[in-house]
Amino acid sequence: MSRVAKYPVSIPSGVEITLNDKTISVSGSKGKSEFTFPHSVSASHADNIITVSYDESSPESTALAGTTRSLINNMIIGVSEGFQKTLLLVGVGYRAKASGKKLELTLGFSHPVHYELPEQVEVETPSQTEVVLKSHDKQILGQVAAEIRAFRPPEPYKGKGVKYADENIRRKEAKKAAGA
């Protein structure tokens, strides 16, 4: 039995659930999300609780059931509270400026990097070296944060680059002068 799927998902107040045959639609104050179940997994909704059921004879459906339960839980948290990721720009002259759905990054290239944000993601720049991304969809938020980080990943010698706020960069020691 899946250890993740056996726990029910509770639905907070202010969240609307629509459960069809193979799809679930979750809407709340932060937005709306939809998900289609894998073929061997289904869900039931009663008393503000969602339970995930699956074919226990197949190991594949056991794994998919745990994933489905986690995705439903993330959808509910996303539309009620939302998700947030913070990126830090470390380096001399590294700056970020947000305007609407566009993010302009100065990362030491000969030109500024322009990044067009998806519809579901909002951006704030509390300071020139800090970018705060917010969304109700955890997967899209992580993808956008990874794409922005990929423009200039942190390097191990000085730590310069775009990094997550909670990320630790393993530092390396520079080479010593030979034969001195």
Question: What are these regions, as identified by a protein language model?
Answer:
Residues 2-146, 150-180:
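N-terminal intrinsically disordered, cationic/polar leader segments
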